[in-house]
Amino acid sequence: MLNAIKKNGLVLAIFACASTGLVAVTHYLTKDQIKQQEQAQLLSVLNQVIPHDLHDNELFSSCTLVQAEELGTEQAMPAYIAKINGEPSAIAIEAIAPDGYNGAIKVIVGMKIDGTILGTRVLSHQETPGLGDKIDLRVSDWILSFAGKQVTDSNLDRWKVRKDGGDFDQFTGATITPRAVVKSVKQAVQYVNQNNQALLAQPLNCGGE
């Protein structure tokens, strides 16, 4: 009986090693493909928040890392510098809304050098389907309401959902989610407005080349 137990244990050990090896090989073979897919998805979003006619450079590789409290996280976040003929024309910056209903929401905001928002997209979230997930463009066009707006000293009070006295619609049964996104977008734009020149002077250091 002991021999049978040892034999079964050996078989299980071999099977476990083989399974681990298969997972490792699969990861090795697919990691480059996954990375390429992620880069393609990000580039697609970048071209949505900064239109093609506002840049002639490769946005994905024109990236610098930024660490700022206004971006909602202690981690360094990427900012993408758009240029035309070598001159800065727009900036897209990622930020975190830490106070979503179901956790952190990652957004990206594209804006002209003068601070006018070109577009905003949600990159990741865990909000409730049918309620808070309306921040996702695949679910509703709410996120498009930021385009064309600016953040100025005179309109800071308008950067709230309507329930709080601002200009942005909330969702039926879900106010926390849009409130968090509006706040995050406002703070990201404020940060870029206040640190415009410093951002443009930073080295490209995201490692996306």
From Swiss-Prot:
Q: Which GO terms describe its molecular function?
A: electron transfer activity; FMN binding
> Membrane topology per the record?
Single-pass membrane protein
Q: Which UniProt keywords apply?
A: Cell inner membrane, Cell membrane, Electron transport, Flavoprotein, FMN, Membrane, Phosphoprotein, Translocase, Transmembrane, Transmembrane helix, Transport
Cell membrane in keyword set:
yes
List where the protein spans the membrane: 9-29
Question: What are the annotated GO cellular component locations?
Answer: plasma membrane
- GO biological process terms on file: electron transport chain
Localization (cell): Cell inner membrane
Superkingdom per UniProt: Bacteria
**Enzyme Commission number, as recorded:** 7.-.-.-
Q: Which cofactor does it need?
A: FMN
Q: Which InterPro entries match?
A: FMN-bd, Ion_transpt_RnfG/RsxG
What is the top EC class of this enzyme, as a single word?
A: translocase
Q: Which PANTHER family match?
A: ION-TRANSLOCATING OXIDOREDUCTASE COMPLEX SUBUNIT G
- HAMAP family referenced in this protein's UniProt entry, alphabetically: RsxG_RnfG
Q: Say which family it is in.
A: Belongs to the RnfG family.
Q: Tell me which NCBIfam families the record gives.
A: PRK01908.1, rnfG
What binding partners and quaternary form does the record give? The complex is composed of six subunits: RnfA, RnfB, RnfC, RnfD, RnfE and RnfG.
The protein's job, in short, is: Part of a membrane-bound complex that couples electron transfer with translocation of ions across the membrane.
Q: What is this protein called?
A: Ion-translocating oxidoreductase complex subunit G
